[in-house]
From Swiss-Prot:
Catalytic reactions on record: Fe(II)-heme b-[protein] + nitric oxide + O2 = Fe(III)-heme b-[protein] + nitrate; Fe(III)-heme b-[protein] + nitric oxide + H2O = Fe(II)-heme b-[protein] + nitrite + 2 H(+); 2 superoxide + 2 H(+) = H2O2 + O2; H2O2 + AH2 = A + 2 H2O
Species of the source: Oryzias latipes
Signal found in the keyword field: no
Gene this protein is translated from: cygb2
Protein name: Cytoglobin-2
EC number(s) reported in the record: 1.14.12.-, 1.7.-.-, 1.11.1.-, 1.15.1.1
Family: Belongs to the globin family.
Enzyme class: oxidoreductase
Length: 179
């Protein structure tokens, strides 16, 4: 399974690199354009994620056997999860000026995925990369090289917070063959 071991978050930097006010403004401006089509964008992200990384589907009993992207696109469960993902990102973006709120939201996401769903933390990093690709392809007029760098910084911070929650709940390192 991706050759990843549980505990992938143990090489975490001490803290996430903070966003400047200008970077927060860039994120909020570009997100406004994305969020107008949040469900469709979220569905595109999840479909590409599952097509390119089919091992991620193991965590979704409702659509883990779907192979066809068109079938995935019609799945109400996939659409529902896409909305949840996009709404979580929206909450982060809307609260960039409130680091405690961002930390709290991402801690809840991380703990749920670690404890309840047992999702390997590396999938957050992978999904972030997929999301950045989809956003830059679907919104090229807004996602310039500079904007992509700012969003990469945000996604790194999201990953840092989520993996912090994994560490907090005692995510243990085990052999990847045991996963």
């Amino acid at each position: 399974m991706l050759g990843v071991q549980r505990g992938e978050c143990e090489d975490r930097p001490e803290r996430a690199e903070p966003l400047s006010d200008a970077e927060m403004e860039i994120i909020q401006h570009t997100w406004g354009h994305v969020y107008k089509n949040c469900e469709d964008v979220g569905v595109s992200v999840l479909i590409r994620f599952f097509v390119n990384f089919p091992s991620a589907k193991q965590y979704f009993s409702q659509f883990q056997d779907m192979q066809d992207p068109e079938e995935m696109e019609k799945s109400s469960q996939l659409r529902q999860h896409a909305r949840r993902v996009m709404n979580a990102i929206n909450t982060v973006v809307e609260n960039l000026q409130d680091p405690e709120k961002v930390s709290s939201v991402l801690a809840l996401v991380g703990k749920a995925h670690a404890v309840k769903h047992k999702v390997e933390p590396i999938y957050f990093k992978i999904x972030s990369g997929v999301m950045l690709s989809v956003l830059s392809e679907d919104f090229p007029e807004f996602f310039t090289a500079e904007v992509q760098l700012v969003w990469t910084k945000l996604m790194a911070a999201v990953y840092w917070h989520v993996t912090g929650a994994y560490t907090e709940v005692g995510w243990l390192q085990v052999s990847s063959s045991a996963v």
